[in-house]
Regions:
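Conserved phosphate/anionic-ligand binding catalytic regions in large, soluble enzymes, centered on
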Residues: 1-13, 110-128
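Amphipathic alpha-helix face/heptad-repeat signature
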Residues: 3-7, 35, 42-49, 81-91, ...
Length: 162
């Protein structure tokens, strides 16, 4: 998910670069520059997700091996993984919102890039939800599970409307 999210934000930066300094877009330069800065931060964070994901997964795999002796370790590791994936989902939704903002002011010649960005960002939201669901299977805390599931269902509905 991190790779797709970083690629999406790089593509947003590409669109911004092809909008900034263009005569037909002089009146939206400040907005496009802000979008580019936000996308750059999200891209950097997403690149870190790639490395962090393996650490989170290793913790879950280690806990899974000892789950019979120490079930609380699997619960903790699974919750950590759920929270990690939830944060990635939130960043994916932020990216989708950035694309939506940029689509209103960005270079019209890049219509296909806007559509690709939206598909990638929505895919990142959906992929994060898949990861959340898989890890929720190992969480016993029903209140935690319900809170997380309600959150991602709400966010997914929001994402599909963009």
């Amino acid at each position: 998910v991190g790779m797709v999210l970083s690629t999406t934000n790089a593509l947003i930066g590409y669109i911004c670069n092809l909008t900034i300094g263009k005569k037909n877009y002089e009146n939206v330069q400040d907005e496009v520059i802000k979008i580019k800065e936000e996308a750059n931060k999200l891209k950097t964070k997403a690149l870190n997700v790639i490395d962090e994901d393996s650490k989170v997964l290793n913790k879950v795999l280690k806990a899974y091996k000892i789950r019979k002796d120490e079930p609380e370790k699997l619960e903790e590791a699974s919750k950590d993984s759920v929270l990690f994936c939830n944060e990635v989902m939130e960043d994916s939704l932020k990216t989708l919102k950035l694309v939506n903002r940029l689509e209103k002011v960005g270079n019209r010649m890049l219509a296909s890039d806007f559509k690709i960005c939206k598909k990638y960002a929505l895919s990142s939201v959906e992929s994060s939800i898949v990861n959340i669901d898989i890890n929720l299977k190992y969480v016993q805390d029903k209140e935690f599970k319900e809170k997380i599931k309600n959150n991602y269902l709400k966010k997914y509905e929001e994402a599909k409307k963009i």
